[in-house]
Amino acid sequence: MFRSIVVGTDGSETATKAVRQATELARAVGARIELVSAYEPVSDARLREESIQVPADLQWMINPRDDVQAMLESAARGIRAAGVEVEVFALQGDPADAILDVAEERGSDLIVIGNKGMTGAKRFLLGSVPNKVSHHAPCSVLIIRTV
């Protein structure tokens, strides 16, 4: 049935619900999970050009890859604890494009994503990622009602 399930997450509470449900499904059918998140760093040049002072609690936005990778690894530990094989992908760029690219590259049979997503930086417009993914996916899409 399903061998490879791509799961998009931004680390939010709603995305975590989708990850949990995808993990249960993967365990039930013996599939592996490809866990995907995307980030878009703010360039130092742009910060200097616009004289932007970044508060300490938002420094992750300048080079968020490490934080995204840490969030993915934390989620992956929970998936592995459930007995499911998982690989993580922290990709720079648009979240929907990252999910679609991984699904295509890995030959995935299913994409699981929450119906709403939001981060502290509000880089996910509510509903825009699942909408784009559902319209352009190379495989079936399961949209989890998370709110």
Task: Locate the predicted segments by residue.
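Short secondary-structure boundary segments
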Residues: S37, N115-K116, T146
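A short acidic, glycine-rich active-site loop
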Residues: V54-A70
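Glycine-rich, Arg-bearing micro-motifs that act as flexible, cationic patches
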Residues: L110-H135
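Small/aliphatic-rich secondary-structure junction motif
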Residues: R3-A56, A82-V84
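Short, conserved catalytic or interaction motifs in soluble domains
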Residues: R123, P138, T146
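Conserved beta-strand positions in the Rossmann-like core of class I SAM-dependent methyltransferases
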Residues: E34, E87, L142
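Structural beta-alpha unit
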Residues: M1, T14, S51, S74-I111
